[in-house]
Amino acid sequence: MRVPEIPEETASPLRAGDPPAQVAGHPLIRRSARVPRWRARLADHDAASLAELLRRAGGTASAARAVSGKVVRHAFGAEPGAPAPAWDARALAALGVGAWAHEALLALDPAPSLEIAERAPAQDDTLRLVLRAGDGALIESVLIPGPARTTLCVSSQVGCARACSFCETGRLGLERQLAAGEIVDQVRIARALAAERGGAPLRNLVFMGMGEPFDNLGEVLKAIRLLTDPRAFRFAPSHVTVSTVGVADKIEPFFRDARAELAVSLNAPDDARRQAIMPVNARFSMAALKEAIARALPPGRRVLFEYVLFDRFNDAPEDADLLAAYVAGLRCRVNVIPCNPGPDPALRPPSAARLDAFVARLSGHGVTTLVRRPRGRDVGGACGQLAGMARLRQPEPA
């Protein structure tokens, strides 16, 4: 049997009741987990929040909406590689923006808030990026070229508090949330790099980088609204995927508000094994997760289940049977991902024979199944390997 393949695509504060789990001797939430409270950058605003800012500056609701649309198109609507648009009173006047709005708009910095700290090209042409924020926080993104389109793996937090045992980011703890503009700026930087490198344009975004997107859902949704705005970045909502470890109580708000697809990281066929590698399962069982998906999944939409395969842990034919039974009744597909080297040496990738047997068994149940092959593994850019903060957080020379 020929196994279908796709390239690897590496899509709000924690609630007070979440346990302060520990990893490697330190609390998972190491500093303030809040979003930075600055809103002085233009990319921190989608059209709606920009209109609200302008309304508070004295404009009528209709005038504020009209101006915000013009500004979004001017600031973010240019093709990749085009010069940065002018941002001064003359440029605003040329757009037809009245003087009443100039002060509020010109207080917003249109430049990206991130800078490239490291570029790590892989042998397969994947590019791992480490980006530095204004406060020194380090964020990783991964640019994954393909024949028809390039994919960017986007981060939503600095670190992560969810502590999945196969994920390097989970060992770092949660340092802080990313602001919407910092999420957007990952895309701005990557889109320019993709144009510079040639090849297929950046058209696909997956929130599968550092962090749990549902733990920063407000900023993630705001960023997605700007990224999918036809006046701005123009990403198709069907080409934006947000991956969650399974924070079940955020699934309904996500489907209500997001212009994006949903991926759920499952990784085990039963609660006992899932909880052994994913602490979130202690709060949201697999049954609760399935119920939340079934209740919220809009008509005509599908959910993507991600299933990282570990040798002799979750890769037996009987495990495929259990997984097929679990996803039965849901409009879905399953991405099977051979695990990459990570923090737990006991979790190893399966042999090719066990991988093929698992996929054949799952497909035999009528489950749409794809295999996601590793990309960027040699530079630490594959699924579960993003830990650039630890690599680069070195004392600065005196």
From Swiss-Prot:
Record flagged with keyword Cytoplasm: yes
Origin superkingdom: Bacteria
Binding residues for S-adenosyl-L-methionine: 211-212, 243, 265-267, 340
UniProt xrefs under Pfam families: Radical_SAM
Residue intervals of the Radical SAM core domain: 146-378
Subcellular location: Cytoplasm
Bridged cysteine pairs (disulfide): 153-383
A single GO BP: tRNA methylation
Stretch list, region Disordered: 1-24
EC number: 2.1.1.-
GO CC terms of this entry: cytoplasm
Sections of the chain in a coiled coil: none
Enzyme's top EC category: transferase
Binding site for [4Fe-4S] cluster: 160, 164, 167
Cofactor binding, note field: Binds 1 [4Fe-4S] cluster. The cluster is coordinated with 3 cysteines and an exchangeable S-adenosyl-L-methionine.
Residues forming the catalytic site: 140, 383
UniProt record similarity statement: Belongs to the radical SAM superfamily. RlmN family.
Name assigned to this protein: Probable RNA methyltransferase sce1580
Organism: Sorangium cellulosum (strain So ce56)
